[in-house]
Amino acid sequence: MASDRQNLQDAFLNHVRKTKVPVTIFLINGVKLQGVITWFDNFCVLLRRDGQSQLVYKHAISTIMPSQPISLYEGEDAS
């Protein structure tokens, strides 16, 4: 049963990718990146801004902050 559930990280990234919500990504060295997440996997995130793409490795990411409030598992039982 537990394996049927998507982990929080994947659910969050998939939601902001599908809805094209702009995000701010803070790296562990303090750099701030902004754009829209277009793709992700277990190791990296593809961030797009002004027609340019940046491949960002997850181990370098400190925080991902969406530009607007998001609701995960809308309409589903989150328990």
Swiss-Prot record:
Molecular-function GO terms, alphabetical: RNA binding
Keyword set, alphabetical order: RNA-binding, Stress response
Domain of life: Bacteria
One GO BP: regulation of RNA stability
SUPFAM superfamilies registered for this protein in UniProt: Sm-like ribonucleoproteins
InterPro entries hit by this protein: Hfq, LSM_dom_sf, Sm
Disulfide bonds: none
The UniProt record lists the keyword RNA-binding: yes
Keyword Nucleotide-binding: no
Described function: RNA chaperone that binds small regulatory RNA (sRNAs) and mRNAs to facilitate mRNA translational regulation in response to envelope stress, environmental stress and changes in metabolite concentrations. Also binds with high specificity to tRNAs.
HAMAP family in the cross-refs: Hfq
Family statement: Belongs to the Hfq family.
Name this polypeptide is given: RNA-binding protein Hfq
Native organism taxonomy: Bacteria, Pseudomonadati, Pseudomonadota, Alphaproteobacteria, Rhodobacterales
UniProt gene name: hfq
